[in-house]
Amino acid sequence: MQVLVRDNNVDQALKALKKKMQREGVFREMKLRRHFEKPSEKRAREAAEAVRRARKMERKRLEREGF
């Protein structure tokens, strides 16, 4: 991952790098890899995430349609 530093503004470059890493899911991946996750736990977590995503999409769809 690469970020340009303009006018020696390192703080702005760090902020941009952190934003890019957040979008890419690097922090989330690091958090998940800190400890071993059993395959059954992984399946359960992914299923729960899918349910959460589906509910969120349904809420947004209903909000868009005006219900």
Swiss-Prot record:
One of its GO terms (molecular function) is structural constituent of ribosome. One of its GO terms (biological process) is translation. One of its GO terms (cellular component) is ribosome. InterPro entries: Ribosomal_bS21, Ribosomal_bS21_CS, Ribosomal_bS21_sf. Keywords: Ribonucleoprotein, Ribosomal protein. Belongs to the bacterial ribosomal protein bS21 family. This is Small ribosomal subunit protein bS21. The lineage of its organism: Bacteria, Pseudomonadati, Pseudomonadota, Alphaproteobacteria, Acetobacterales.
